[in-house]
């Protein structure tokens, strides 16, 4: 089985609203175990007289009972929309609520400090200042923001940022930042390798191998960032041998019916896009109206939600052709104990999503790190050291194995695994095979964020 970690997604401003399908993927890492140094130092040094050990009445230091503060930054009121960035926050908060109900970490309650940065760089810096410098949080968890302008300040303060969503390039740029999918980049202050990041083609390989897809369409707006992202998707598809059909619509007055008619004419097997959620719903409706049936209308983890029936209510055929891909276990896979625990704790939420599950996994990751530090003291440095040692972390099976390793050169190929689900009315998101066995050896393609 190929283990892997995932680096930042393709980074363009539109990534927050359309499917980032040429995801940056990286291989597993193996870090030095800092605990060995501690063990060696304990075995060296001056020898004490035996009498010093005969009557040791010393008591251990009193256990700290003060709450552990963690921060969650989410662009809850961003221009993109009120719920676009709140899934990871809600999942993480649900984890901490359940954790506190069970006694917290080593008897200490976790105090969650929330901050909405409004989707702006100024707001993000204000949140970082409040949480890192004023509230003195031990760590940030499940960061999900449109503009991570304060990332360098978080890194400079050596505050571990655990399980954040790689909407920007920060998680492939700075030390002490640990994205939910991992990273192989040097993370020395320069993005990726000499300013370039790398994405791989496992999504395209999957549909070619498993479903015989040969023709893929990519739909974008006539807007620079949308078009740039579409070109990246097209490049990945061509690398996998697809015939690529490009479709562009006017951002202000999109004619989705014309696009749908051409998709039917061209015989597209797959449809990828660089458009927003509302545009996707209108595209699907147009596809149903003209009878453009496809093997898969492919979306990503951000749109892997229970709101599909409402969002695509006017397009039943296209709705049932929706497929989602990602790096975490399907949030409807209640046959898995870790998913059952997540669903039980979040049953009060109106909707469920893959981003909620990944936020839950991020909070669990922090908890595992903090528990490892309980004996010596739960500090930023100790939690950060645990994260640096992370090797194949899965959050109890919720994630594909995640690791961090600073490679001097980018890998040319990777062994990459994939979680896949498709929507079916009456069943919801139905998993397609074992994510730990749906693996491919694929090329890495360079891009500039």
Describe the residue ranges of each PLM region:
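Beta-alpha junction/loop-to-helix N-cap segments that form part of ligand/metal-binding clefts
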Residues: 53-56, 83-87, 103-176, 250-256
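Extracytoplasmic ligand/sensor domains, especially the bilobed periplasmic-binding protein
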Residues: 137-248, 295-318
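Segments of small-molecule ligand-sensing domains
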Residues: 348-356, 367-430
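Signal peptide-proximal N-terminal region
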Residues: 90-112, 239-241
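Bacterial signal peptide processing site
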Residues: 44-48
């Amino acid at each position: 089985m190929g283990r892997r970690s995932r680096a930042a997604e393709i980074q363009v401003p539109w990534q927050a609203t359309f499917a980032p399908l040429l995801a940056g993927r990286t291989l597993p890492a193996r870090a030095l175990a800092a605990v060995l140094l501690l063990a060696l130092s304990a075995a060296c040094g001056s020898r004490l007289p035996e009498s010093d050990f005969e009557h040791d009445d010393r008591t251990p230091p009193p256990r700290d009972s003060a709450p552990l503060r963690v921060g969650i930054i989410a662009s809850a009121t961003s221009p993109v929309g009120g719920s676009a960035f709140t899934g990871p926050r809600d999942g993480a908060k649900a984890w901490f609520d359940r954790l506190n109900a069970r006694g917290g970490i080593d008897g200490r309650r976790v105090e969650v400090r929330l901050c909405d940065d409004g989707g702006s760089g100024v707001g993000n810096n204000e949140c970082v200042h409040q949480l890192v410098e004023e509230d003195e949080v031990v760590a940030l968890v499940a960061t999900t923001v449109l503009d991570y302008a304060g990332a360098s300040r978080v890194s400079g303060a050596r505050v571990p940022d655990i399980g954040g969503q790689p909407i920007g390039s920060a998680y492939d740029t700075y030390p002490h930042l640990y994205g939910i999918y991992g990273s192989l980049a040097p993370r020395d202050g320069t993005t990726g390798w000499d300013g370039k990041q790398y994405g791989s083609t496992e999504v395209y390989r999957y549909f070619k191998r498993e479903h015989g897809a040969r023709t893929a369409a990519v739909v974008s707006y006539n807007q620079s960032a949308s078009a740039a992202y579409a070109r990246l998707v097209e490049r990945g598809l061509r690398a996998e041998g697809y015939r690529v059909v490009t479709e562009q619509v006017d951002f202000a007055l999109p004619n989705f019916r014309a696009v749908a008619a051409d998709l039917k004419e061209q015989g597209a097997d797959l449809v990828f896009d660089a458009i927003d959620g509302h545009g996707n719903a209108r595209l699907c409706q147009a596809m149903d109206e003209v009878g453009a049936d496809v093997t898969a209308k492919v979306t990503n983890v951000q749109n892997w939600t229970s709101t599909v029936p409402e969002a695509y209510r006017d397009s039943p055929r296209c709705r049932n052709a929706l497929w989602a891909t990602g790096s975490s276990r399907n949030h409807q896979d209640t046959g898995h104990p870790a998913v059952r625990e997540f669903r039980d704790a979040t049953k009060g939420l109106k909707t469920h999503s893959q981003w909620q599950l990944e936020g839950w996994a991020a909070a669990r990751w922090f908890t595992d790190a903090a528990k490892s530090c309980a004996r010596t003291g739960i500090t930023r440095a100790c939690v950060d050291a645990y994260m640096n040692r992370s090797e194949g972390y899965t959050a109890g099976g919720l994630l594909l194995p995640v690791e961090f390793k600073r490679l001097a050169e980018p890998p040319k190929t990777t062994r990459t695994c994939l979680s896949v689900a498709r929507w079916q009315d009456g069943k919801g998101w139905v998993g397609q095979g074992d994510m730990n066995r749906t693996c491919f050896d694929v090329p890495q393609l360079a891009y500039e964020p």
